Amino acid sequence: MSFSISGKTAIVTGGANGIGLAIGRHFADKGANVMFADMDEARLVKELGENKEDSNIRYFAGDLREKLTLANLLSATIDAFDQVDILINASRQVVPSDPLNPDDDAVEMLLQQNLMTSLRLTQLVAKRMIKQAEGREKGMAGTIVNMSSIAARRTHPDLLAYSVSTAALDQMTRSLAVALAPHRIRVNAVAFGSVMSASLKDTLRDNRSFRSDIEEHTPLGRIASPTELAEAVQYLSCDGSGFMTGQIMTVDGGRSLLDPVAAPAH
């Protein structure tokens, strides 16, 4: 059983900061070719430097909500590395929402950002993976990992939009796993709790009490580093998880195991 991703080519969205950047760097360190994709070109250049033809790291800047941009991302990846074996949908947005405000468009916005962008890119990349595998009878054609959240199955009034979008992403993961299995493409997701991402850093900076609240309600008593999440994503991307598809792997330090009601009564 191999956990290696060396020589594989991966597209990682949300690659300019936080979780996406950590996953992309981890994959590159493990010998994979990585295309970092994000809207923030200045941040991509700052973190990765200029694109170099002899490097296993490239970046692509553009608005992934646009279909043409998605097609151009795939073309740029093929031009750089000739193939694509792994897709990591790590582009996501978290915004508060008002569940009683009919003018609040957060649900529509996050469904577009967190669900539809991943769905459209997955469809394009899956077609390419199927084409690459033509004439090859053994082995997987590719693997896709979606970055989800435990918010998909927990509730908080201010996170209605985020919870809805990640729950939809989980169902997309399961549905595509069944649809793509005959083509030897695996689709899984990682549902994470609190990870020290760029967005969480901003939140904790503005709300200092949140950190102790998170840590107290996480059995392992801390917030995960992006690198810890990257290790889980590597596992789902490698041959070692070759019989896993349609699964939502939880990486939350045990947080989702706790009952918020302290009283030992039902």
Language model features by range: what are they?
Residues 98-111, 214:
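Substrate-binding pocket helix/loop in short-chain dehydrogenase/reductase
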Residues 149:
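Residue(s) in the substrate-gating loop at a strand-loop-helix junction
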Residues 122, 165, 173:
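Active-site helix of classical SDR
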Residues 100, 154-160, 182, 221, ...:
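Active-site loop immediately N-terminal to the catalytic Tyr-X3-Lys motif
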Residues 234, 245-266:
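Short C-terminal tail/terminal secondary-structure segment
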